[in-house]
């Protein structure tokens, strides 16, 4: 599988994903991980918090690791620094995830190679919430409900 970096690929990944394990999810509403996970939960995804520091986040049980999650997950969304991603990639492979997603500003080629070699799809340096809103029309949550993003002025 190649690295997913085009609109068609991102649309497919988001449309096929039902469950998202969010590694590094914070219980604090003002943290980017919480904001993105809440958005995805509000848009019908099953969000599975992964953070050893909490027992519950967003009304869901919080697990200390991917391995501790009962049952399968479709996507592993990483809110950790780039150096922390390779072990998470190995856990995602062991868990049987389909997608390893590294958030905006995060790229790790070693982690990508681990996931790609095991057949996972990989997204790097993109925010799942931003991509969902941009591609699948969840723009109304941000206060815009056109369904279309344009760089051109109307008129």
What are these regions (language model features)?
Residues 104-130:
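Rossmann-fold NAD(P)-binding glycine/threonine-rich loop
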Residues 1-6, 56-86:
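Glycine-rich, highly charged phosphate/nucleotide-binding loops
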Residues 71-109:
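Mid-chain, well-packed structural core segment of small domains
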Residues 43-45, 95-98, 118-120:
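A short helix->loop->beta-strand "cap" motif at the edges of active sites that frequently abuts
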Residues 21-23:
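Conserved beta-strand elements of the Class I
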Residues 26-30, 38-57:
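NAD(P)-binding Rossmann-fold cofactor-contacting core
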Residues 57-60, 74, 110-113, 131-137:
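Short, charged, surface-exposed secondary-structure boundary motifs
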Residues 131-155:
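A charged, well-structured terminal subsegment
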């Amino acid at each position: 599988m190649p690295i997913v970096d085009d609109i068609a690929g991102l649309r497919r990944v988001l449309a096929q994903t039902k469950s998202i394990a969010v590694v590094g999810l914070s219980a604090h509403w003002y943290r980017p991980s919480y904001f993105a996970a809440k958005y995805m939960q509000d848009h019908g995804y099953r969000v599975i918090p992964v953070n050893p520091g909490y027992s519950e986040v967003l009304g869901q049980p919080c697990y200390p690791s991917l391995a501790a999650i009962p049952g399968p997950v479709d996507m592993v969304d990483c809110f950790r620094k780039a150096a922390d991603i390779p072990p998470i990639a190995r856990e995602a492979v062991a868990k049987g995830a389909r997608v390893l997603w590294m958030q905006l500003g995060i790229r790790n080629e070693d982690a990508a190679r681990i996931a790609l070699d095991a057949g996972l799809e990989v997204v790097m340096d993109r925010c799942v919430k931003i991509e969902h809103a941009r591609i699948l029309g969840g723009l109304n949550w941000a206060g815009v409900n056109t369904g279309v993003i344009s760089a051109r002025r109307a008129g």
